[in-house]
Curated annotation (Swiss-Prot):
SUPFAM superfamilies: PLP-dependent transferases (SSF53383). Its EC number is 2.6.1.83. Involved in the synthesis of meso-diaminopimelate (m-DAP or DL-DAP), required for both lysine and peptidoglycan biosynthesis. Catalyzes the direct conversion of tetrahydrodipicolinate to LL-diaminopimelate. GO terms for molecular function: L,L-diaminopimelate aminotransferase activity; pyridoxal phosphate binding. The keyword Transferase applies. InterPro entries: Aminotransferase_I/II_large, DapL/ALD1, PyrdxlP-dep_Trfase, PyrdxlP-dep_Trfase_major, PyrdxlP-dep_Trfase_small. Belongs to the class-I pyridoxal-phosphate-dependent aminotransferase family. LL-diaminopimelate aminotransferase subfamily. This is LL-diaminopimelate aminotransferase.
């Protein structure tokens, strides 16, 4: 008989954002006259910019002509995009990443999910709490986590991110092999200094560990002293893989383009202690399981690196960060403590009560959708909610007025 991967039975309920969508749909069915403002899932609300659309259109036109048609492209991505990424996102900040260390994909979610496939089932993993659920769930599926008990999986080393440590976790007190970090952080919006990030790199070097660094929100950093890439830290190219996306800075949530950086100096080890190139392993996995991002989408992504494209992306970021400022200011007035909103589009708010209860209250009384912190971590996330700045200024103002009334 055909049998299942029983690790899937260890997963907790449904995926967080699917659960939220179901609750919202039920509320709207029961209250069709009420307008709902969604500040939960981090989906952008503005259209693609003129430079991106122009490049997209031109590439689509090329696909209609036999002489300029593009069929299967290089699985790792076209050189024109990889070179633009290397020059603008890394070399311009003193990081020595080169084009062939970049793997273009259709989303950071896929990459952060799939990267764990190249590591052994016995790998000891450290994951922040709270955390983007994908990091944890994919390791549950792979059988690395053990059973779930008292709000946590038995074999995971949890890195608590709390008010006491400014939502930047401390180094683990036990030896781990694989470390997930995300800055600016999702969900908390917290950031890390270069000195703070160096401590993690030094730990990884000393323990022959690897850091998986999710930098999907780096474009929202307003403080020039903060690192945008882990490769700004000396030695990180030997112990870190970085993930980035065009989803938020360029509005590609529905277009789908991202990339992963695997430096050639980055190594992992077999059971006998022999080193192996993670670049070679990821390339093998990538080429086996992925056929590449479409040519028009890669041309659209490359347009974000033109002078016009950069200016347009900055305008998008400024638009959402202005919204974040409004959210934070409103909760200052209400007396709710929070983190984020300064270098991140997310505001992590202490709701002073159970996360799901606060979620239900805001939905029923204010018609506003947030994300309950417990969905990111039942221990350190419960009691908080995440509000996203991805919406129009008009809706943000309206939502804040409703929240103020509901909490009065």
């Amino acid at each position: 008989m055909i049998t299942i991967n029983e690790n899937y039975l260890k997963l907790q309920a449904s995926y967080l954002f699917s659960d939220i969508a179901k609750r919202v749909a039920t509320f709207q069915e029961e209250n069709p006259e009420k307008e709902v403002i969604k500040l939960g899932i981090g989906d952008v609300t503005r259209g693609l910019t003129p430079s991106v659309i122009a490049a997209f259109h031109q590439a689509v036109d090329e696909m209609a002509n036999d002489s300029t048609f593009h069929g299967y492209g290089p699985e790792q991505g076209y050189a024109f995009l990889r070179e633009a990424i290397a020059e603008n996102d890394f070399q311009s900040r003193g990081a020595g990443i080169v084009a062939d260390e970049i793997f273009v994909s259709d989303g950071a979610k896929c990459d952060t999910s799939n990267i764990q496939e190249i590591f052994s089932a016995e790998t000891k993993i450290a994951i922040p709490d709270p955390v983007y659920p994908v990091y944890l769930d994919t390791n549950v599926m792979a059988g690395r986590t053990g059973l779930f008990a008292d709000g946590r999986y038995q074999n995971i080393v949890y890195l608590d991110s709390t008010k006491e440590n400014n939502f930047v976790p401390e180094l683990p007190t036990e030896k781990v092999d694989l470390i997930y970090l995300c800055f600016p952080n999702n969900p908390t919006g917290s950031t890390i200094t270069k000195a703070g990030l160096k401590r993690w790199v030094d730990y990884a070097i000393e323990n022959k560990a690897l850091i998986l660094f999710d930098a999907a929100y780096e474009a929202f950093i307003q403080d020039d002293t903060l690192p945008k890439s882990i490769y700004e830290i000396e030695g990180a190219d030997k112990v870190a893989i970085e993930f980035r996306s065009f989803s938020k800075n360029a509005g590609f949530t529905g277009t789908r383009c991202a990339y992963t950086v695997v430096p050639k100096a980055c190594m992992a080890y077999d059971s006998e202690g022999n080193s192996h190139s993670l670049h070679s392993m990821w390339n093998r996995r990538h080429c086996t399981k992925f056929n590449g991002v479409s040519y028009p989408i890669q041309r659209a992504a490359a347009a974000t690196y033109t002078p016009e494209g950069k200016a347009e992306c900055k305008e998008l970021i400024d638009y959402y960060m202005a919204n974040a400022k409004v959210v934070x200011s409103n909760h200052d007035k209400l007396g709710y403590s929070y983190v984020g909103g300064e270098n991140s589009p997310y505001i992590w708010i202490d709701g002073k009560t159970d996360s799901w209860e606060f979620f239900d209250m805001l939905l029923s009384k204010a018609g506003v959708v947030c994300t309950p912190g417990a969905g990111f971590g039942t221990c350190c996330g419960n009691g908080y909610i995440r509000i996203s700045a991805f919406n129009s200024p008009e809706n943000i103002e309206k939502a804040m007025a409703r929240i103020t009334e509901a909490l009065s």
